[in-house]
């Protein structure tokens, strides 16, 4: 049962939209659209729709900042349910590629984020275990995963009193991808101490599952906090999932290896016939090494390129994705596409770019042809999935409107009574000086400023210039990872700095009630960043504050500017009439600032600054131990054993306090 927790009730405008959407979905309509202005409470409307329908829901968005914000909000809305987070676990990713013209092969290079990997595994585990799941996902949901039926077939179910020999249990754990590690115990590891076995599930954060045996009988089972060395909740039954969505059973693995060998022989015969000896040798060496790894360990580097064989699909079949984990046992589910006017075009463009790169790798003997089936969903496959869709946007594109037909529900009024922001045109000749004067007034009121520019260079120079003038300002760019981006937004809201400058990162969905001034530099430069949709979305960031104002710096009024201003002014008239009718006085949105996503790093900073450890609460000390332990393991992996030993000694000191 999905249970919504909120101190607020939907406004009349929201109630009408919720009622219409729920009725449309219950009637069986596949597509519907919520057209809601910025600040009208679209997220709260989405939460109420989910509560009324009471079915598993996938919420997709096009960028990681918005995903992080949605995750925080829905964790609050559905605090008693399973709210999950599924975005790419790469902090950095360079896919393998080959450039024939220069004969340059670019090896795959990446760095993964362990926390994001854990959250992804938690998402699939929850989907296979519970019905009350809300999952926030990026475009990653469209990329290939393992077969959910094979994955669920690999689970290990523990029940008190069950009979299993230690040898058999350890073999099963290894088959599931868990590694024995009695010294540096970490996620996806297990350790053995006599009749006690500790298992650290790959999707857990701080706890392990401790199993106590009497001979071959499972005598006791409970959660155990490895940081605080404390016993947790007793368990009567526990389901353990594998360490990877690509894990497969022994039978399937043997068949996959057989199929890969057959495809390899066929491809080698082709290269030999075409007298392509370099490609022949390259492919033979690569695939035979991967086969050796698969045979001995069940995994290999780039295992996803053999996904077709591991999942048992045929050439050209639709790959398994997160959607298939939702649809397990033919379960009904809802897909909400947030900021659909941007998300859907992004989903549409994914397949072509991926295919072009991989085709070159196949042609030149770096990969087998089956690697082409390790791909994202084609747009038609995505949009025709066996589920129902709700598109959400302040500016839906023609595609959403066409698909939804008459099932379009408007949400123009804001529960707070806030109007669309006032728009002022300013001469772009003196835009830097004018903005400085306007920003000072806003900052004196303890409010914030967002600035959007067209180039990275201008953003950097503007940041440097305003810092010299004494304004606390930061610049947000595309190189910043998801967690750091969230920290910057938290910093702006909390007052750590007063102005944030960006290019295309300050548009859709960011909920920043403290921001009362939006400055759009060079607003008259027609293009993607200054289209009607972009302007309306950017201006909407000021619609959560009663003092909201937008400055458009320009030399002329473009068609896009005029359309954006006309739409905004028309909405202001409707909103003023609504406020008068219901006697509403506009008030700024009040929204608590979410906790940091990287508390562990902050605690590390406290420690390094010499905070007295004996005065630190036990819970904070435990988190600090966790951070130091992570650093110790990283040092050990890098063969920096002296550093690892020094960190170990610090951990022991902390545990002795």
UniProtKB/Swiss-Prot annotation:
Swiss-Prot/TrEMBL domain comment: The beta-hairpin motif is involved in DNA binding.
Annotated binding of ATP, by residue: 36-43
UniProt motif (Beta-hairpin) ranges: 89-112
Protein name, as recorded: UvrABC system protein B
Domain Helicase C-terminal: 431-593
Highest taxon above the source species: Bacteria
Organism: Campylobacter jejuni subsp. jejuni serotype O:2 (strain ATCC 700819 / NCTC 11168)
Keywords: ATP-binding, Cytoplasm, DNA damage, DNA excision, DNA repair, Excision nuclease, Nucleotide-binding, SOS response
Molecular function as annotated in GO: ATP binding; ATP hydrolysis activity; DNA binding; excinuclease ABC activity
Example GO BP: nucleotide-excision repair
Compartmental location: Cytoplasm
Family named by the database record: Belongs to the UvrB family.
Role this protein plays: The UvrABC repair system catalyzes the recognition and processing of DNA lesions. A damage recognition complex composed of 2 UvrA and 2 UvrB subunits scans DNA for abnormalities. Upon binding of the UvrA(2)B(2) complex to a putative damaged site, the DNA wraps around one UvrB monomer. DNA wrap is dependent on ATP binding by UvrB and probably causes local melting of the DNA helix, facilitating insertion of UvrB beta-hairpin between the DNA strands. Then UvrB probes one DNA strand for the presence of a lesion.
SUPFAM superfamilies: C-terminal UvrC-binding domain of UvrB, P-loop containing nucleoside triphosphate hydrolases
Domain UVR: from-to ranges: 622-657
Occurrences of domain Helicase ATP-binding (ranges): 23-414
NCBIfam families according to UniProt: PRK05298.1, uvrb
């Amino acid at each position: 049962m999905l249970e919504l927790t909120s101190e607020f009730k939907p406004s009349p405008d929201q109630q009408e939209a919720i009622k219409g959407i729920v009725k449309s979905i219950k009637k069986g309509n596949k597509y519907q659209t919520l057209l809601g202005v910025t600040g009208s409470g679209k997220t709260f409307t989405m939460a109420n729709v989910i509560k009324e329908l009471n079915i598993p829901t996938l919420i997709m968005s096009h960028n990681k900042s918005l995903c992080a914000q949605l995750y925080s909000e829905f964790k609050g809305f559905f605090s008693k349910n399973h709210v999950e987070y599924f975005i790419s676990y790469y902090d950095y990713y360079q896919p393998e590629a080959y450039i024939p013209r220069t004969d340059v092969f670019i090896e795959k290079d990446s760095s993964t984020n362990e926390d994001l990997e854990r959250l992804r595994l938690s998402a699939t585990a929850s989907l296979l275990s519970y019905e009350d799941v809300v999952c926030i996902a990026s475009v990653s949901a469209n990329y290939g995963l393992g077969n959910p039926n094979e994955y669920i077939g690999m689970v290990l179910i523990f029940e008190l009193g069950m009979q299993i020999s230690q040898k058999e249990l350890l073999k099963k754990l290894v088959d599931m991808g868990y590694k024995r590690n009695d010294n540096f115990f970490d996620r996806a590891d297990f350790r053995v101490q006599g009749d006690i076995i500790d298992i650290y599930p790959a999707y857990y954060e701080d706890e392990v599952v401790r199993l106590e045996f009497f001979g071959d009988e499972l005598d006791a089972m409970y959660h155990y906090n490895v940081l605080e060395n404390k016993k947790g909740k007793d368990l009567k039954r526990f389901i353990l999932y594998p360490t990877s969505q690509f894990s497969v059973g022994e039978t399937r693995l043997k068949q996959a290896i057989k199929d890969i060998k057959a495809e390899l022989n066929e491809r080698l015969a082709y290269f030999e016939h075409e007298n392509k000896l370099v490609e022949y040798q390259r492919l033979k060496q690569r695939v035979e090494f991967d086969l050796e790894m698969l045979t001995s360990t069940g995994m290999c580097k780039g295992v996803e390129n053999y996904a077709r064989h591991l999942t048992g699909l045929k050439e050209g079949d639709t790959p398994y994705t997160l959607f298939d984990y939702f649809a397990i046992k033919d379960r009904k589910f809802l897909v909400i596409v947030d900021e659909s006017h941007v998300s859907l075009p992004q989903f549409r463009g994914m397949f072509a770019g991926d295919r072009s790169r991989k085709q070159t790798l196949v042609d030149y003997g770096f990969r087998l042809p089956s690697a082409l089936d390790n791909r994202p969903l084609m747009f038609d496959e995505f949009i025709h999935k066996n589920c129902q869709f709700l598109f959400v946007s302040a500016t839906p594109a023609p595609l959403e409107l066409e698909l939804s037909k008459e099932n379009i529900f408007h949400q123009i009024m804001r529960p707070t009574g806030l109007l669309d922001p006032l728009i002022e045109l300013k001469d772009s000749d003196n835009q830097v000086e004018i903005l400085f004067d306007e920003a000072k007034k806003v900052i004196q009121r303890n409010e914030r400023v967002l600035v959007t520019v067209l180039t990275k260079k201008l953003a950097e120079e503007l940041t440097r210039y305003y810092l010299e003038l004494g304004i606390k300002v930061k610049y947000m760019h595309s190189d910043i990872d998801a967690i750091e981006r969230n920290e910057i937004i938290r910093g702006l809201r909390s007052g750590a700095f007063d102005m944030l400058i960006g290019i295309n990162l300050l548009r859709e969905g960011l909920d920043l009630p403290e921001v009362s001034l939006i400055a759009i530099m060079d607003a008259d430069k027609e293009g993607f960043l200054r289209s009607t949709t972009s302007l309306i979305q950017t201006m909407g960031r000021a619609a959560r504050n009663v003092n909201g104002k937008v400055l458009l710096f320009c030399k002329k009024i473009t068609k896009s500017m005029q359309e954006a201003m006309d739409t905004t002014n028309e909405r202001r008239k409707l909103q003023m009439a609504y406020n008068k009718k219901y006697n509403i006085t506009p008030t700024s949105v009040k929204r608590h600032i979410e906790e940091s996503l990287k508390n562990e790093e902050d605690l590390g900073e406290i420690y390094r600054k010499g905070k007295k450890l004996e005065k630190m609460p036990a819970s904070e000390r435990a988190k600090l131990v966790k951070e130091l332990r992570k650093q110790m393991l990283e040092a050990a992996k890098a063969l920096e054993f002296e550093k690892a030993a020094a960190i170990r000694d610090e951990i022991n000191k902390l545990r002795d306090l």
